[in-house]
Regions:
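Conserved AdoMet/S-adenosylmethionine-binding subsite of the radical SAM
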Residues: 1-164
Length: 164
């Protein structure tokens, strides 16, 4: 099934987890996150996308969720994400970018992304991309991981604010 999907779409299947909720909200029970992270670890054939407005909670909550199974911790008890976990932060303004992107970059993840919806003002993302330079990388070596993907959009409907 997964091979057929990849052959047709050229990518792995993705699960946009809790798209109408926030896994890292303080009201979400820790036990629920433990079960969720166990499921993520047991489904390496799927890419799991977690988008949050509370990126400041993510690193601590992920570590706590993984400590009980021991599935995702290194020998020195540091959180290590599964290869199929993507973490994203909602950013709508430069102030949010300045505050939250460093928190996103400090959260271990296979991939990191921004959801800039609705984009309510200009945001400078200079310096946050992977820098590919064939002369400075050995084959198979990746430069420092930064932001892998950006989703940009505006609002719709009556009274929608313009996108910048």
């Amino acid at each position: 099934m997964n091979e057929a999907f990849f052959a047709e779409h050229g990518r792995r299947q993705r699960v946009f987890c809790a798209s109408l909720a926030d896994v890292f909200d303080n009201e979400v029970p820790g036990l629920w996150r433990q079960h969720l992270m166990s499921l993520v670890a047991k489904t390496p054939n799927l890419d799991w996308l977690f988008l949050t407005k509370r990126i400041g909670n993510a690193r601590k909550m992920l570590t706590e969720a993984c400590m009980h199974d021991g599935l995702l911790l290194t020998a020195d008890d540091q959180y290590r994400p599964p290869a199929n976990l993507w973490i994203g932060a909602t950013i709508t303004s430069q102030a949010e970018a300045d505050r939250d992107i460093p928190k996103l970059l400090a959260t271990p993840a296979a991939k990191r992304f921004l959801s800039m919806e609705p984009l309510l003002g200009p945001v400078n993302l200079t310096g946050l991309w992977r820098h590919w330079n064939a002369s400075s990388c050995e084959p198979g070596e990746l430069p420092e991981l930064m932001i892998d993907w950006v989703i940009v959009g505006g609002e719709s409907g009556p009274g929608a604010r313009p996108m910048h």
